[in-house]
């Protein structure tokens, strides 16, 4: 991996973050509401419907159980959509990244800046769901504050994965495969909607490798005031999903942008 592929050092990536922020704030309200729509629909739809039939899960109401899962899910969704659709547009259609490379920025700076911006949007989305849950009495405000670092790390992990997909995709059409074959199954296998231990053993083993499952295992106990098991393991797995895809995407983008 060449030097130009890695971040140049310092805070150069902040220029990328700031550029994306300035473009986003023109339509900030619509963006925030869009990121909240799906998780809120899941929360009220499944919570009100299944909650009556299911009752309590792991000692708490099903809606409280679901709310914690939707916080992680909203962070995943926001980071994913930002790094595949929006970032791809900046790379392919607008050719913003190409223009950035004529400055002192490297591919690594661009990737770090895009990941940081996606994690910011993920944090806003996850916090938004958390605020709704706290207002409805399904968690405490202080618990939401404790969960913020995990929400941000979750955003970084899925942003890093999304950058790999963006680096590989020849067009927007290919993102549907990532959504339907990776993101949607992960939602149902990671314990967001129902406990992982209710799945067949084979699916439980798959869930053990999924970043969303580790995020939920950190966020849910925090939101519900329960002890957190295997904290170092969960954080370690999420960090792997941040670092390894980052290295892969920077290498792939070097070849793609230098053609």
UniProtKB/Swiss-Prot annotation:
Alphabetical list of InterPro entries matching this protein: ABC2_TM, ABC2_TM_bact-type, ABC_2_transport, ABC_transptNodJ, Nod_factor_ABC_transporter
Organism (species): Rhizobium leguminosarum bv. viciae
Subunit structure as annotated in this protein's UniProt entry: The complex is composed of two ATP-binding proteins (NodI) and two transmembrane proteins (NodJ).
Superkingdom of the source species: Bacteria
Statement: the UniProt record of this protein carries the keyword Transmembrane: yes
GO-annotated cellular components: ATP-binding cassette (ABC) transporter complex
Membrane topology of this protein: Multi-pass membrane protein
Pfam families: ABC2_membrane
A GO biological-process term: oligosaccharide transport
Protein name: Nodulation protein J
Domain ABC transmembrane type-2 as annotated: residue spans: 30-256
Compartment(s): Cell inner membrane
Ranges annotated as spanning the membrane: 32-52, 64-84, 116-136, 141-161, 174-194, 228-248
Record's function text: Part of the ABC transporter complex NodIJ involved in the export of the nodulation factors (Nod factors), the bacterial signal molecules that induce symbiosis and subsequent nodulation induction. Nod factors are LCO (lipo-chitin oligosaccharide), a modified beta-1,4-linked N-acetylglucosamine oligosaccharide. This subunit encodes the transporter.
Similarity field: Belongs to the ABC-2 integral membrane protein family. Lipooligosaccharide exporter (TC 3.A.1.102) subfamily.
GO molecular function: ABC-type transporter activity
Main location per the UniProt record: membrane
Keyword entries, A-Z: Cell inner membrane, Cell membrane, Membrane, Nodulation, Plasmid, Transmembrane, Transmembrane helix, Transport
